[in-house]
Amino acid sequence: MIGRIVQILGSIVDVEFKKNNIPYIYNALFIKEFNLYLEVQQQIGNNIVRTIALGSTYGLKRYLLVIDTKKPILTPVGNCTLGRILNVLGNPIDNNGEIISNKKKPIHCSPPKFSDQVFSNNILETGIKVIDLLCPFLRGGKIGLFGGAGVGKTINMMELIRNIAIEHKGCSVFIGVGERTREGNDFYYEMKESNVLDKVSLIYGQMNEPSGNRLRVALTGLSIAEEFREMGKDVLLFIDNIYRFTLAGTEISALLGRMPSAVGYQPTLAEEMGKLQERISSTKNGSITSVQAIYVPADDLTDPSPSTTFTHLDSTIVLSRQIAELGIYPAIDPLESYSKQLDPYIVGIEHYEIANSVKFYLQKYKELKDTIAILGMDELSENDQIIVKRARKLQRFFSQPFFVGEIFTGIKGEYVNIKDTIQCFKNILNGEFDNINEKNFYMIGKI
């Protein structure tokens, strides 16, 4: 079926078809002359459909011929995507040749049926001490990652990818939504150097691409992750940045003629976010655990975009510049980060009590810092001096050498299981290492 372009509004293109030949919603249309795909969004009457362009509309003109493919946008899925960079259409953009795929999947899929989903309180061991102790990941859960530039978001993501691949025999999918091209490029080459590239699929919709690409690229990556899950794997899904997904939706919504809601966001914000997040779930075959980088506009947590995202999260990890300045990596703030899974019924009484004791010591140390700076340690009570010394040891013990950081630090990476993590922190709290210098706790795995 062939139609003709009748109107172009930025990324929005209106196409007229003959009566009884109107394409379905989400059908892919193709403009051969420009090698450009469109996706049908609305049927607006008079045999006209309104579409999103998944590419630049520069040079398009009215009355160009448009072909209805009679199919939705399909992306290659499976092991053929590992180690490759794909765009929103599932085409490789890494100059490493074509992807030979036996199977393609639509980017718009329904979430698993309730009867197919598996709800468990199983904790996903990451091998990173501070995460496993204070903000454990739920297998199949959703984790929000807050952090500015240069505090270690990328290196943390790379270590998680490595640990899931090597220790759990799983795989990862990284979706760059509105990514800076430089960041995506750096991420690719750093993972190549760290030998984890063959365990991850990369799907990029870069910052310079039209809003249609940035809005749909998350769905392309999600379809690839879902296929790995159905293959029986534990999948770690990274989305960077979930805010830019919302922003792309805002741009498209205005062009589609929808009335904006609070702060200018699209009226369908909650629905769009829900459709994306509901697909991230565990089934009888495997699990998808997602780590989502979240930008908070003007540090306003009540902004509709982050507040809509928060409702879906199980854990929150905050990367702190103050901790990074102390040279403690990963620079995760133990007092700001939290997890709903830190519950005695899920992690056990011992884990819960030790985690709370660690937080108490660190909070007390934080409160005493001003006193120490003015009067010195000697003016503190004997009990407070013990708390401060142990808290400093705990703080340094949160540092950990990463496998993916070996090429930078020269220190061999360490994977620490949850059992060892709990025991080591318990020993520090009990005073078994009170006579050992705090420097000895820096950049080690288990004691």
Curated annotation (Swiss-Prot):
GO molecular function: ATP binding; ATP hydrolysis activity; proton-transporting ATP synthase activity, rotational mechanism
Alphabetical list of PROSITE patterns matching this protein: ATPASE_ALPHA_BETA
Keyword ATP-binding: yes
Keyword Transport attributed: yes
Entry membrane topology: Peripheral membrane protein
Binding site for ATP: 147-154
InterPro entries according to UniProt: AAA+_ATPase, ATP-synt_VA_C, ATP_synth_F1_bsu, ATPase_a/bsu_AS, ATPase_alpha/beta_chains, ATPase_F1/V1/A1_a/bsu_N, ATPase_F1/V1/A1_a/bsu_N_sf, ATPase_F1/V1/A1_a/bsu_nucl-bd
Location of the protein in the cell: Cell membrane
EC numbers, comma separated: 7.1.2.2
Protein's recorded name: ATP synthase subunit beta
Organism: Carsonella ruddii (strain PV)
Lineage: Bacteria, Pseudomonadati, Pseudomonadota, Gammaproteobacteria, Oceanospirillales
Gene giving rise to this polypeptide: atpD
